[in-house]
Amino acid sequence: MQNPSKAEIKEILQRSKRIAVVGLSDRPDRTSHMVSKAMQDAGYEIIPVNPTIDEALGVKAVSSLKEIDGPIDIVNVFRRSEQLPGVAEEFLETDAPVFWAQQGLVNEEAYQMLKEKGRTVIMDLCIKVAHAVTK
């Protein structure tokens, strides 16, 4: 498994506008909330994807990626590593080009599934940190 280069990640972040966040919590003390808030503050549109909440960051939550209207640039995932193949399968039903699993999340099965379909895959990297170091 290999992530795109720092230059490629910078380009992905520069061209992207909408980030669907799978597993986004409505609790401000959760990492998913803090990272997504930072990305929202940086100008990205955040779409919460979590069937157990009504909204997060002032945005109505959807229960699955399939419920999102319009294009998705990045799907940022805050789920356990063993759940990544299931998220990847749902991701492949969208037109989103980039699957981004947060720091500490790696799953070789999901990685191979997505690469075989020509999608960009980033794993084990915090999107907030990547955004900060590639500005």
Curated annotation (Swiss-Prot):
InterPro entries documented for this protein: CoA-bd, NAD(P)-bd_dom_sf
Domain of life, per lineage: Bacteria
Transmembrane segments: none
UniProt-listed Pfam families: CoA_binding_2
GO CC field: cytoplasm; cytosol
PANTHER family per UniProt: COA-BINDING DOMAIN-CONTAINING PROTEIN, CYTOPLASMIC PROTEIN-RELATED
Listed name of the protein: Uncharacterized protein YneT
Originating species: Bacillus subtilis (strain 168)
Organism ancestry: Bacteria, Bacillati, Bacillota, Bacilli, Bacillales
